[in-house]
Amino acid sequence: VLSASDKTNLKAAWDKLGGQAANYGAEALERTFASFPTTKTYFPHFDLSPGSAQVKGHGKKVADALTKAVGSLDDLPGALSALSDLHAHKLRVDPVNFKLLSHCLLVTLASHHPADFTPAVHASLDKFLATVSTVLTSKYR
C-alpha cells in the first residue's frame, strides 16, 4: 500500500520528468530488451533496434500508462483495468516481464536524475511499480 509520503514522492518525481517520460519509457524498453533478450519475443513485428520508431512508440504507451497511474494513485485497479485485460487476455505477457521492465525503468530514471533519486524516492517508485505490476497481473487469475 502506498503511503501519503509515497504518493507525494511519486507525484514530485513524475513532475520532474517533464516532457521526457516517453523518452525514458523507450530507454527502459531498450534496456529491458538488451538485458533480458527473451522479452523480445512479445514484439516479433517490431524493429527493436535502439531508437526505432516502434520502440519509441511503445515507450510512449508505457509512459502514458504510468502517468495515468500516477494521477490515479487512489484507484490503480480502475485506472489500469483495460491495460490489465489487454496484457492478460490478448497479449498474454508473462508476469515476470513487468518486474524486469520496472527494474530497467528505475535504472533509467536514476541515471537521468541522480540527485533526485534519493533512497526515499527510490523506495516509493519501487513500491509504485510493484503495485502497478500486481494490478496488471491481477486478471491472470
Curated annotation (Swiss-Prot):
GO terms for molecular function: haptoglobin binding; heme binding; iron ion binding; organic acid binding; oxygen binding; oxygen carrier activity; peroxidase activity. InterPro entries: Globin, Globin-like_sf, Globin/Proto, Hemoglobin_a-typ, Hemoglobin_oxygen_transport, Hemoglobin_pi. The keyword Metal-binding applies. The keyword Signal does not apply. The modification Phosphoserine is found at S3, S35, S49, S102, S124, S138. O2 binds at H58. One of its GO terms (biological process) is hydrogen peroxide catabolic process. Gene3D superfamilies: Globins (1.10.490.10). Red blood cells. The modification N6-acetyllysine is found at K16. Pfam families: Globin. This is Hemoglobin subunit alpha. It comes from Blarina brevicauda (Northern short-tailed shrew).
